[in-house]
């Protein structure tokens, strides 16, 4: 009886802890991509130069007008995705259906096919864009074996920080697949952090995005973050976009058609919310690169589309993804080696 009582108390305490973490995350969308970038640059000073070189490449592509303007199926970039799910508690071991819902949310956002695009204010609608970028779970792994594109690993780590340790098996995480062929997404317990993205020009083994398990996919029960748009925001970073306010007061995100704004917006604003002399339109708080609730985010702009797609031009950082074998028929029609119980957990 005593043992059962203790187990019941333990389960109750775990539930309370998860509820507290959920409330803390729901209070504000906490993307730490900028602070992560600054930390990585402080560790590796050359990273800033590599990042600047990529930004210069993008500017040159845009200046030359060489970003693909064609429309139709051939102009849609398809990105193979591998999702690394790291769980300690059963609630963190998200289902295939939850993963599918996130891929669907990414595709609807980047193709502007969400029903809530009808909520875009009339003065911003002419700027909204179908980015013609799609995402698909990989069907071939780096060894050309068949895969579901989903990896699950039990880990003894209960909480992760934005320090990339979840990206390495040696740290009880999961190693990245070749970043030239796949978008790596790690899903784990980040506590109060919603997610973050790697830095352009950073190490290949760290390339990708990390999302808190409670903000991944749709209908998660996480109030304000249950439509999969945290991942949309972080993939925006992964494709070169910055926060609208340029991470400083009235800063510049480098995109001509996004109005300057004083800082991030939260919750679900309405009407014109003016700052930084943008009174004619106000802040573009419904843009995916702000911090508003999922239900209030519904657009990327044409300028953001052009910048993201410039990375896929010949010689661009993301160009190799277009020739990835991740979406090609696997040569070996068998599942990869079991990954539910990695060797470092065998007893």
Task: Pin down the residues of each PLM region.
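The catalytic-center signature of Zn2+-dependent metalloproteases
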Residues: 223-298
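Bacterial Sec-dependent N-terminal signal peptides
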Residues: 1-36, 106
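Structural recognition of the beta-strand scaffold that forms the well-ordered cores
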Residues: 78-85, 134-137, 182-187, 208-213, ...
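A recurrent domain-boundary module in secreted/ectodomain proteins
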Residues: 301-346
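Propeptide-to-catalytic entry region of secreted or membrane-anchored zinc metalloproteases
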Residues: 28-178
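Active-site-proximal segment of zinc-dependent metalloprotease catalytic domains
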Residues: 162-243
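Stable alpha-helical elements in mature extracytoplasmic
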Residues: 98-102, 227-231, 301-304, 317
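Sec-exported extracytoplasmic/periplasmic mature domains
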Residues: 104-115, 237-244, 313, 317
């Amino acid at each position: 009886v005593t043992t059962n009582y203790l187990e019941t108390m333990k389960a109750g305490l775990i539930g309370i802890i998860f509820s507290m973490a959920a409330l803390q995350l729901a209070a504000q969308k906490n993307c730490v991509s900028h602070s992560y970038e600054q930390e990585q640059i402080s560790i590796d000073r050359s990273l800033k130069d590599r990042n600047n070189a990529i930004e210069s490449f993008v500017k040159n592509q845009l200046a030359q007008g060489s970003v693909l303007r064609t429309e139709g199926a051939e102009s849609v970039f398809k990105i193979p995705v591998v999702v690394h799910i790291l769980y300690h508690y059963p609630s963190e071991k998200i289902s295939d259906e939850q993963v599918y819902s996130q891929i669907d949310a990414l595709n609807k956002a980047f193709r502007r096919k969400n029903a809530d695009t009808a909520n875009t204010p009339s003065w911003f609608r002419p700027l909204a864009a179908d980015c013609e970028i799609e995402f698909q779970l990989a069907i071939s792994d780096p060894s050309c074996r068949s895969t579901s594109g989903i990896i699950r690993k039990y880990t003894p780590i209960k909480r992760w920080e934005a320090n990339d340790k979840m990206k390495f098996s040696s740290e009880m995480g999961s190693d990245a697949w070749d970043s030239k062929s796949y978008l790596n997404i790690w899903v784990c317990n980040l506590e109060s952090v919603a997610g973050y993205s790697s830095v352009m020009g950073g190490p290949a083994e760290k390339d990708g995005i990390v999302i808190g398990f409670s903000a991944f996919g749709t209908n998660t029960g996480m109030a304000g973050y249950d439509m999969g748009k945290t991942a949309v925001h972080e993939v925006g970073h992964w494709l070169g976009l910055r926060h609208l306010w340029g991470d400083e007061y009235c800063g510049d995100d480098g995109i001509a058609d996004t109005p300057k704004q004083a800082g991030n917006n939260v919750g679900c604003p309405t009407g014109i919310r003016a700052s930084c002399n943008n009174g004619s339109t106000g802040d573009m708080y419904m843009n995916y690169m702000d911090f508003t609730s999922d239900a209030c985010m519904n657009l990327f702009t044409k300028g953001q589309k052009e910048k993201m797609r410039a990375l896929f031009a010949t010689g661009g950082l993301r160009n190799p993804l277009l020739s990835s074998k991740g979406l090609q028929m696997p040569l070996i029609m068998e599942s990869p080696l079991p990954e539910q119980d990695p060797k470092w957990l065998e007893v």
